[in-house]
Amino acid sequence: MLPAPHFGGSGWRIKLHKLIVSYKKSGMKLFKSFAFAFNGIKICFTSETNFKIHVLLAVVAILLGIVFGISTNEWLIIIFCIAFVISMEMINTAIEKLCDVVNKDIHPAIKKIKDIAAGAVLMAAVSSFVMGSIIFLPKIIIYLKTL
């Protein structure tokens, strides 16, 4: 039988145990972080109409990508656009909810903050629409010519 490894005294078992426990705790923290994140997505989906619209348009873009057999690079652009718009919508929702907690009344500074956040979503949506149009319009035109 091989001798036990020497790690500087008998305290190595305690150190190893502490290391294992810390990894287990960090794993639970990671699990909880994912649970909180999925809960945030659920909150947006159940309470925000614009979020539902963006998800629906994302599904349409994915279906069009499948139907037209878009390239890997085109998929990367579409996936980035979907993630970008949905993420911006979630950030906008978080900012709006935070502003509502800070001040329920219509305050000029709060209005500006909400308008800027909404503008960020609009910029993301418009730029994503343009990129999607560049990818899909030529394919749609070719398809329509074959009818």
Segments (PLM) and residue ranges:
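Glycine-biased, low-complexity coil/linker segments
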Residues: 8-9
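Hydrophobic alpha-helical transmembrane segments
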Residues: 13-86, 91, 106, 114, ...
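Transmembrane alpha-helical segments of integral membrane proteins
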Residues: 92-108
